[in-house]
Amino acid sequence: MHNPQSRGHNLSQAMSDQTVTNPAAEAQEGEITPDTPDTVDKVENTPVENVENPAEATPGEEDQASEATSANAADLLEQIAALEAAKASLSQVVEERNSQYIRLAADFENFRKRTQREKEELELQIKCSVIADLLPVVDSFELARTHIQTETEAEEKIHRSYQGVYKQLVECLKRIGVSAMQAKGKPFDPNLHEAVLREATNEHPEGTVIEELKRGYMLGDRVLRHAMVKVAAPPEEGSASNTNPTNDVTDV
């Protein structure tokens, strides 16, 4: 049998024999660490680049930068000039359009006023035409009232009936603006009167309307029908003592 102590001794001897010296490890142990004095001197003597203040540009680089800046400035000036020209052109267009708008607005306003006047004139002409056709009816009523003499109660009743119609017609004409002229005793006006007779007389000044033969009418300030009148004329020489005025009546 083997001795246990002898076996343990042999195992320890074998392990110590297998231990090999590592040259690389020994070399690493001999390297200089950052904490060594030589390393500190090298770090202190190493130049440090100035990060905050980079190296100044060379003259060639400055010339290139100046040329680029000049080119950019020239381009900007050209763009500004083009924009100014476009602005002036647009301002001229706006001014022309504004002038056209003002002229169109004025033309439209004139057209509106003209058409309004034409419309009112047409309405007035139609109204005058219709009323003028009714005036002979009014004349007939007035002539009947003047010349008809009723003799019986029945005739008087009929007379009052159609005179009532006449009054309604006259009131209707008044409501739409028709008025009868009052020519007698006024100076003759060719715009209102139509002289159909002249009578030589000393009782009225020359040119005075002495009789209204047919009544004239107006619609507002427009003449619907001229009044037919007899006008006073100066007496002829030697006829002043003539007491019969009908002998001096002459047609116009």
From Swiss-Prot:
The gene is grpE. Residues 1-70 are annotated as: Disordered. Homodimer. Participates actively in the response to hyperosmotic and heat shock by preventing the aggregation of stress-denatured proteins, in association with DnaK and GrpE. It is the nucleotide exchange factor for DnaK and may function as a thermosensor. Unfolded proteins bind initially to DnaJ; upon interaction with the DnaJ-bound protein, DnaK hydrolyzes its bound ATP, resulting in the formation of a stable complex. GrpE releases ADP from DnaK; ATP binding to DnaK triggers the release of the substrate protein, thus completing the reaction cycle. This is Protein GrpE. Belongs to the GrpE family. GO terms for molecular function: adenyl-nucleotide exchange factor activity; protein homodimerization activity; protein-folding chaperone binding; unfolded protein binding. It is found in: Cytoplasm.
